[in-house]
Amino acid sequence: MKSHIMDSKSTKKRDLSKYFLPDIRQARKRIKKADIIKDGFEIPANIINYGEGKTYHIKTFGCQSNLRDTEVMMGMLELIGYEYNEDVNTSDLVLLNTCAVREHAESKVFADIGILDRIKKSNPNFIFGVCGCMAQEEAVVNRILKSNFNVDFIFGTHNVHRILNLLEQVIFEKNLVVEVWSHEGNVIENLPSKRTNNLKGFVNVMYGCDKFCTYCIVPMTRGKIRSRRKEDILDEVHQMISEGYKEVTLIGQNVNSYGIDFDNGENYLFNNLLEDVAKTGIERVRFTTSNPWNFTRSIVDTMKKYPNIMPHIHLPIQSGDETILKKMNRPMKIGDYIDLVDYIRANIPNCSITTDLIVGFPNETKEQFNKTLELYKRIEFDNAFTFIYSKRDGTVAAIIPDEIPLSEKKERLQELNEMVKTFSKKNNEKYVNKVLDVLVDGPSKKDKTVISGYSPQWKVVNFTGSAKSGEIVKVLITSASRFTLNGKMID
């Protein structure tokens, strides 16, 4: 596929009609079943050694899927000789792998684009690009182009595997390259990658989301559900085991929708995959993120059966009020959610449960917000990621008139966060005087005399003792705060 290009020196005012821009209406469509392509990557002959003696930097915003995309792009860039550089200012190539979930993330990206634009003006050989979920948004790409930033290339989430082809066009055609596919992509296997952690790694099990929550842009930026074949997933896990990995996290926009897009009659769903991954023998298995109304009890039963599946579930509810949930297009009854949590705790008593909550959805009343507080008290979550509703152009919720002032939304967020702090500390204190198995990361970032790692429940544990990165050691917990457990290593 030929990208749409334009001579960046030809005019100050760009003719946007010449670009193949993202189209939010097209992105909503679910056109065809995804193909699984095993040989969708090759190095363009013209740039096989182009990166030798050059460095690159990728700044990643957002979720685990973006982090995994970054690892894939790192792998491809290093195949042509590039070396990673921590310093943006001295790198020859910089990519911004962006997130579109909230306005704050977009603001930070545009600030970075401005910084990179200034570097480009002082060093014409410097190359920088914008990719990821923001690049899938019409308004964002239009803003970049109309602002006349000296960006070299823009591409989205569906053609990450083509980064070297796009770079080739930038190098030899000296033009701005824009290649954003609005329709969902295929499943491209056998891509190179450079994992950023040599103990714990992410494995994509599926891509995209078909839930269309009214506030969420992800179904448009990531496309429809596309599940990977179990054989490819298990091969990747086995490869990680052979390389010494201790922990794998299965990731997707909604992992427990895995397999629903397979051909009729192929009854292989997430609980089946989770069991097969556990059977590989890798020491720790995690997964994220789950949608509660697809979270079957068979998943809980599988977790109970295999001790190497870690007892932590991230289960976003977003609101404690059913009217708000209906407006969000999240058809979950609060009673059903409570029943699910009760089932989890009855079968996996040591399981930690975390959630996501949105405050100030358009026209949320004080009474509706109070129901979120009531649910939080009932569940006593281990932790929560809390946010003020962020309007996303192209979503259904974006056109709803909203009468709630921002000041009131901030007050509600503060009230909710105080509750989160209270129960996080209360739950952590339950581990005092207990012994936990901790996978060691290494010295704590804040105190090099202390070792840090994670418990099975996804709790940060700081402890004294002598342990090497990658070891799983027993730690007696002696104290707890909201964010961490503290203890000492025991024999």
Curated annotation (Swiss-Prot):
Catalyzed reactions per annotation: N(6)-dimethylallyladenosine(37) in tRNA + (sulfur carrier)-SH + AH2 + 2 S-adenosyl-L-methionine = 2-methylsulfanyl-N(6)-dimethylallyladenosine(37) in tRNA + (sulfur carrier)-H + 5'-deoxyadenosine + L-methionine + A + S-adenosyl-L-homocysteine + 2 H(+)
Comment on bound cofactor: Binds 2 [4Fe-4S] clusters. One cluster is coordinated with 3 cysteines and an exchangeable S-adenosyl-L-methionine.
TRAM domain ranges (all copies): 429-491
The keyword 4Fe-4S appears for this protein: yes
Class of enzymatic activity (EC top level): transferase
Cofactor: [4Fe-4S] cluster
Keyword annotations from UniProtKB, A to Z: 4Fe-4S, Cytoplasm, Iron, Iron-sulfur, Metal-binding, S-adenosyl-L-methionine, Transferase, tRNA processing
Top-level taxon: Bacteria
InterPro entries named in the record: Elp3/MiaA/NifB-like_rSAM (IPR006638), Methylthiotransferase (IPR005839), Methylthiotransferase_CS (IPR020612), Methylthiotransferase_N (IPR013848), Methylthiotransferase_N_sf (IPR038135), MiaB_methiolase (IPR006463), rSAM (IPR007197), rSAM_horseshoe (IPR023404)
Record keyword RNA-binding present: no
Family that this chain belongs to: Belongs to the methylthiotransferase family. MiaB subfamily.
Function, in words: Catalyzes the methylthiolation of N6-(dimethylallyl)adenosine (i(6)A), leading to the formation of 2-methylthio-N6-(dimethylallyl)adenosine (ms(2)i(6)A) at position 37 in tRNAs that read codons beginning with uridine.
Protein name: tRNA-2-methylthio-N(6)-dimethylallyladenosine synthase
Lineage of source species: Bacteria, Bacillati, Mycoplasmatota, Mycoplasmoidales, Mycoplasmoidaceae
Gene this protein is translated from: miaB
